[in-house]
Amino acid sequence: EALYQEKDKQAAQAAAKAEQKAATQSDEGEWTQPEGADWAEPGMKSYTCPSCGAELICDETTAATSCPYCGNTTIVPGQLSGMQKPDYIIPFKLSKEDAIAALKNHYKKKPLLPKIFSAQNHIEEIQGVYVPFWLFNGSADADIRYNCTRSMTHREGDYDVTDTQHFMVRRAGTVKFEKIPVDASSKMPDENMDSIEPFDYKELKAFSNAYLPGFLADKYDVSVDDCAPRADARCKSSCESALRSSVTGYSTCVPEEENIHIRRGKVQYAMLPVWMLHTKWNGRDYLFSMNGQTGKLTGDLPVSWGRFWAYFAGIAGGLAAVLSVLLFAL
């Protein structure tokens, strides 16, 4: 029975993948995966984390003592082979000290953070990691129709009268995309990577191992095909935003009908710099990610419920005071 359940599960997954592929083929072409050289060069070594499965690469002068994703301290040396060499890299611009300072500054801007968190919270591990990204290039043809309104209010006797005009607005055009990033590591939370964007591609360099000493590099484990739905969604979202920004002068603007056709092009493989900071407080681990180029930082923080309810009570008290004044005036 367990065997049949497993086969049913595999069949359902295969059907879902086929359906997804059919949906993406309604656009034009497929994303072209880069054909990079083998990365197995002299002076390079790899580690594997038995806890989360991360595969990490570094040069022979760099000691990897723990996993930057899960904090496991028993990572195992492995054999470097069959790894695709990246096309590009953005070197680290900010130091470990910059990352620590950014984390402390991050604490200051959180009014609901427990006071003792920053005092008792200790950085267990901080590592610079080159995170693998697929960079998608292509274009999209879009034709979107909006229902827009323009409202004006005037006074007639004792009444305020609002006149609303309705307009059908159409926008069409072609939007080109260059290097739309999608992280290619299953260990890295997608929301973390989305939060620390953008990266400045003006500092993109041809890949060289010379940028690796002192840092780790994560091997990609999410293929171009598996990243394609996210890339398509980001292309469409960017296209919608570009056309929507051209519709101005209206009170409201709601898209009624849209037709977006993606033309898929070349995909490039890049390593982008991220500082990973592990902290611990009250027996719980907290992971923070900082853009190693721009300093933008994100991560989860605990909430002081005492501060939360005090903050909420303050807002409620203010609203009650305003309401009482209004009622008294009436």
Language model: regions and residue ranges:
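Residues immediately within or flanking Cys/His clusters that coordinate Zn2+
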Residues: 44-46, 64
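Short cysteine-rich clusters marking metal-coordination/redox-active sites
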Residues: 49-52, 67-70
